[in-house]
């Protein structure tokens, strides 16, 4: 469970792998579920890799379709959010540099209202 998103499965691997300069997480989003808020990082760049399923991702004002094995780079200071399609969405998220999440991230509930 991720803070504020009880339907999202979130597994962080950064500490378990003792990563010093990057971060890694796995996220499983149930079918039709939209992450409840958008977020941005002040310094961290992220790459989202779809490992199963599909859906859509909103990057600033652009909405893109996601399919299995798509990879999307999101630079710092860019708002992002995602939603699962009918088969759900499983993603790996790689971020660099590793930062204190509380000090680097801003979030906004309802950022992608559609």
Predicted regions and their residues:
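Short glycine-/acidic-enriched loop or helix-start segments at secondary-structure transitions
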Residues: 60, 68, 83-84, 103-104
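Short beta-strand His + acidic residue motifs that chelate non-heme Fe in jelly-roll/DSBH
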Residues: 37, 57-58, 74, 80-86
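A short hydrophobic beta-strand segment most commonly corresponding to one strand
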Residues: 73, 86-103
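Short acidic-glycine-tyrosine-enriched beta hairpin
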Residues: 61-77
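A generic "binding-loop/recognition-motif" signal
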Residues: 43, 62, 78, 87-88, ...
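Short, conserved beta-strand element in jelly-roll/cupin
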Residues: 26-29, 40-58
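A short, N-terminal "cap"/entry segment at the start of jelly-roll beta-barrel domains
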Residues: 1-23, 30-31, 36-37, 102-114
């Amino acid at each position: 469970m991720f803070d504020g998103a009880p339907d999202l499965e979130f597994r962080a691997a950064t500490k378990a792998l003792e990563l010093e300069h990057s971060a890694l997480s796995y996220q499983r989003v149930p079918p039709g579920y939209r992450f409840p808020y958008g977020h941005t990082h002040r310094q961290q760049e992220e790459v989202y890799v779809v490992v199963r399923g599909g859906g859509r991702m909103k990057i600033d004002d652009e909405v893109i379709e996601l399919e299995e094995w798509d990879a999307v780079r999101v630079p710092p200071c860019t708002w992002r959010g995602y939603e699962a399609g009918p088969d759900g969405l499983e993603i790996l998220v790689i971020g660099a540099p590793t930062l204190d999440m509380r000090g680097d991230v801003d979030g906004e509930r309802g950022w992608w209202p559609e």
